[in-house]
UniProtKB/Swiss-Prot annotation:
Pfam families: zf-Tim10_DDP. Its main location: mitochondrion. Residues 1-24 are annotated as: Disordered. It comes from Debaryomyces hansenii (strain ATCC 36239 / CBS 767 / BCRC 21394 / JCM 1990 / NBRC 0083 / IGC 2968) (Yeast). Mitochondrial intermembrane chaperone that participates in the import and insertion of some multi-pass transmembrane proteins into the mitochondrial inner membrane. Also required for the transfer of beta-barrel precursors from the TOM complex to the sorting and assembly machinery (SAM complex) of the outer membrane. Acts as a chaperone-like protein that protects the hydrophobic precursors from aggregation and guide them through the mitochondrial intermembrane space. The gene is TIM13. One of its GO terms (molecular function) is protein transporter activity. One of its GO terms (biological process) is protein insertion into mitochondrial inner membrane. The lineage of its organism: Eukaryota, Fungi, Dikarya, Ascomycota, Saccharomycotina. A motif (Twin CX3C motif) lies at residues 51-74. It is a peripheral membrane protein. Heterohexamer; composed of 3 copies of TIM8 and 3 copies of TIM13, named soluble 70 kDa complex. Associates with the TIM22 complex, whose core is composed of TIM22 and TIM54. Interacts with the transmembrane regions of multi-pass transmembrane proteins in transit. Keywords: Chaperone, Disulfide bond, Membrane, Metal-binding, Mitochondrion, Mitochondrion inner membrane, Protein transport, Translocation, Transport, Zinc. Coiled coil: none annotated. This is Mitochondrial import inner membrane translocase subunit TIM13.
C-alpha cells in the first residue's frame, strides 16, 4: 500500500528487479560483442603470423606467385577451420541456454 504518493515496496522491487535484469542482459551482450572482436583480432593475428612463417621464407618487396598461392591456401584453411569451430561453439551455447 502506498502512502502520500510513494510507491509501495512490491512495485518498487518489481521495477528494480526488471531494471537489474535489463542491465545484466546489456552487460552480457556487451561482453559477448567484445569477445567476438577479440576472437576476430586473434584470428587475424594468428593467420598473419602462421601463414607468413609458412609461406614467406625470405621477405622481399612483394610475394612471388608461389608465395601468393601458399598464403591464399593457408588463409582459406584457417577460415574453414574458424567457421567449423564457430558453428560448433554457437550450437553448444544455444543448447546450454535452452
Amino acid at each position: 500500500m502506498a502512502f502520500f504518493g510513494t510507491p509501495s515496496t512490491s512495485t518498487s522491487t518489481g521495477t528494480t528487479s526488471g531494471q537489474s535484469q535489463q542491465v545484466k542482459q546489456q552487460i552480457q551482450e556487451q561482453i559477448s560483442q567484445e569477445l567476438a572482436v577479440a576472437n576476430a583480432t586473434e584470428l587475424v593475428n594468428k593467420i598473419t603470423e602462421n601463414c607468413f612463417e609458412k609461406c614467406v621464407e625470405q621477405p622481399q618487396n612483394g610475394l612471388n606467385p608461389q608465395q601468393d598461392a601458399c598464403v591464399n591456401q593457408c588463409l582459406e584453411k584457417y577460415m574453414r577451420s574458424w567457421n567449423v569451430v564457430s558453428k560448433s561453439y554457437i550450437t553448444r551455447i544455444q543448447q546450454s541456454s535452452n
